[in-house]
Amino acid sequence: MGAAVPPSHTVIAGGGLAGLSCARELGSGFTLLEAEDRVGGLARTEMVQGFSFDFTGHWLHARDAEIRALVEERWLRGNLLAVERRALVHSEGAWTEFPYQHNLHGLPARTVADCLIGFVQATAGEPGRALRERPLRDAAEFIQRHLGDGFARHFMLPYNRKLFTVPCEELSPEWGGRFIPRPTLEEVVRGALGIAPGGAGYNATFWYPREGGIEALPRGIAADLTTGEVRLGARIAALDLAGRRVRLASGEEIPYGQLVFTLPLSSVARLLDGPPDVIEAARKLRSVSVTVVEIGADEVGGKRFHWAYFPEDRFRFYRVGSPSEVNPGLAPEGARSFAVEFSHGGPIDPAPLAAHAVASLHELGLLDRARVRLVRWRTIPVAYVLFDHDHAAARAQVIAHLRRHGVHVAGRYGNWEYSSMEDAILSGRDAARALAA
């Protein structure tokens, strides 16, 4: 295999945002392995017939001062749009503002009453006392505890059942975190009366590139990689942790001194040959697949939004994005684009989903099916981590095994969590700093 590998030489598995951020922080002495023909992971953009589509919606939020400065002054300098979120919910024939729990105004009076009464009972009344005083068993109880029965029945339970493909009783209570806004009573009441101030939730404002789609971000980071090695088309087939080698699908073996792993943590089940308990734990790491139907159509008016949520069963999709509403440059003049998202637990025939998407958007007045220019789809096999009751223990066991062999995990999928693009960048940076510590 040639000369011995320096102990400091790092192999980075995966060229998404976390891997790129790690490589940038290291500066040199790394080999980044990316299976695809370009870096970026899921933060990539494709153009077809004048329409640009990201690999599902990617909106950039930068809370960390260092990352914010890098984005503004280096990676996307002069190429940033600051966008105020326009997100809606469609239910019971009405369009309401997102988050649902902050914006009941416009829904049927009975629904508003259900949600208000349920919220008060859950957070301050006697009916909710039991959940307030004991540990929560599952995500359904998390919702009941923090939002009440009305919000649970009318939005939270059906929407999350559609998104995660399993009942909320099968999910652990840890899944909510900072991504589910929990309003005060005053906020709920103001939202019911139509005087909510707006801006609730972690993504009320965001950045998006003026040109190049979201792929402009990983390209900007990659431009900083002036030393080190980036290898494209390098698909990892196996890991030899004891021998500190990565084997590629081509059969080539690449030795390393240190390894940063940003691939899906669940892939450990196929990449390692043991020990059995770790393989079994990795197999317990479940995820949801997403098929995105991308539609380009003549502009016909209709409701304006960046994205909208659909909790009702009559729509098989859980969310519809409109990229051209975020940045008109993502569609030809006189056209509008949509990304219709369907979650599923295994292989699925996308053609019926595409037909359903076009028919539904026609019904909603968002497009005219006779004036559709483009329909295509892509499937993301590992899209959302499933926070089921095995998640925490299985994740901890697999990560602990990797750490015992000097492997650092990074990114949304390496850490097996639900996180943002900024979180992925921070995770890669922190992994590099941990290697140097």
Regions found by a protein language model. Give the residues of each.
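Beta1/beta-strand and adjacent pyrophosphate-binding region of the FAD-binding site
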Residues: A4-A18
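Glycine-rich FAD pyrophosphate-binding loop
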Residues: A13, G27-V48
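Conserved Rossmann-like nucleotide-cofactor binding loop
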Residues: A18, R38, S266
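Dinucleotide-binding Rossmann-like beta1-alpha1 core, especially the glycine-rich loop
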Residues: Q49-A130
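Active-site/ligand-binding neighborhood in enzyme catalytic cores
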Residues: A94, H105, T111-V112, L116-R244
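Acidic, glycine-rich loop-and-beta core segments that form the ion-binding/anion-interacting portion
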Residues: V230-L272
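C-terminal segments that line or cap access tunnels to active or ligand-binding sites in enzymes
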Residues: Y256-Q258, T262, S266-H408
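C-terminal lid/capping helical subdomain adjacent to the catalytic/cofactor pocket in oxidative enzymes
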Residues: H389-A437
